[in-house]
């Protein structure tokens, strides 16, 4: 955490959200206090994000009032979806009244079913199991529906598909309290890069198609996407050696600002003030 804070300061990243997929999980006040104490040694401000469910297990909800009082700014089962819609609905309401927002990782694991990259022409040619875009779109639409019906906010993490982008845009225009984010790789890179079977291009959600990249880019430009995040998830080279068995995730902290400027500012799609705001 401290080393990441130092790197972040060098990359002009002043604030960081510490997601709850830590050991131990950020599901109690004691862990939040520990993180904030350690953060004092770093040169950046750290904002803890608590977990929605204890141990990220998806079943027993955390005490949101306790987490918020300890210093959490939001809750999320980072990297995992809350499969049970009833639990998610209850979490969205309780988080709202506790003064926090739910950040949803939108992924239907039954559809993912062991897939390792975007389902499409490239996955078929490589002969590997693909992840259908419906895995993201279905849960995104569920969260939007819950937010609209319950009249509480929801934040959609790392949007990667054109359909999810359009659903969020439409919902926001009709007054649903939905915000969202994306990462540079989703408006810069496509699944074509996986033809080389390079696991460095494996991430979750997976790289999609050129049409999705275009849709995400348009979402950034028209303001549907509220912020660009790093989605920093580095792994050692040896972990990425086997294409089919490698974990998902890429370095983002050191590259996100430069990547955003390259893709959006130097192509005249955004002005510097817009890029800074993102």
Where in the sequence are the language-model features?
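Glycine-enriched alpha-helix->loop->beta-strand junction motifs that scaffold or abut catalytic
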Residues: 69-73, 96-99, 173-177, 199-200, ...
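Histidine/acidic-residue-rich catalytic or RNA/ligand-binding cores of hydrolases
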Residues: 28, 110-123, 164-171, 186-198, ...
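Conserved small/polar residues in nucleotide/adenosyl-binding loops
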Residues: 1-2, 6-13, 271-277
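His/Asp/Glu-enriched, well-ordered alpha-helical/loop segment
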Residues: 125-153, 200, 221, 227-228, ...
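Divalent-metal coordination cores built from histidine and acidic residues
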Residues: 14-111, 115
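Divalent metal-coordination and catalytic microenvironments
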Residues: 46, 75, 105, 154, ...
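Active-site glycine- and acidic-residue-rich loops that bind
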Residues: 79-92, 155-169, 206-214
């Amino acid at each position: 955490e401290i080393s990441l804070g130092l790197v972040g300061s060098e990359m002009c990243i002043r604030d960081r959200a510490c997601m709850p997929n830590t050991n131990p999980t950020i599901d109690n006040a004691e862990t939040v206090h520990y993180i904030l104490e350690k953060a004092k040694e770093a040169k950046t401000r750290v904002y803890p994000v608590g977990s929605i469910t204890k141990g990220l297990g998806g079943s027993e909800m955390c005490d949101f009032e306790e987490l918020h009082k300890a210093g959490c700014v939001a809750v999320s089962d980072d990297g995992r979806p809350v499969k049970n819609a009833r639990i998610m609905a209850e979490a969205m309401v309780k988080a709202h009244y506790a003064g926090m927002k739910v950040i949803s990782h939108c992924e239907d694991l039954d559809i993912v079913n062991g897939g390792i990259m975007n389902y499409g022409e490239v996955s078929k040619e490589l002969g590997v199991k693909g992840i259908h875009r419906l895995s993201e779109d279905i849960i995104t639409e569920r969260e939007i529906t819950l937010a609209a019906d319950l009249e509480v906010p929801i934040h959609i993490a790392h949007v990667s598909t054109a359909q999810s982008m359009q659903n969020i845009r439409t919902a926001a225009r009709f007054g649903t309290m939905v915000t969202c984010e994306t990462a540079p790789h989703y408006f810069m890179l496509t699944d074509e890069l996986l033809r080389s079977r390079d696991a460095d291009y494996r991430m979750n959600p997976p790289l999609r198609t050129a049409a999705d990249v275009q849709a995400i880019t348009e979402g950034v430009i028209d303001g549907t996407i509220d912020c660009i995040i790093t989605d920093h998830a580095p792994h050692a080279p040896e972990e990425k050696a086997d294409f089919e068995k490698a974990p998902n995730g890429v370095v983002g902290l050191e590259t996100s600002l430069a990547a955003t400027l390259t893709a959006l500012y130097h192509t005249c799609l955004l002005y510097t003030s817009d890029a800074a705001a993102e």
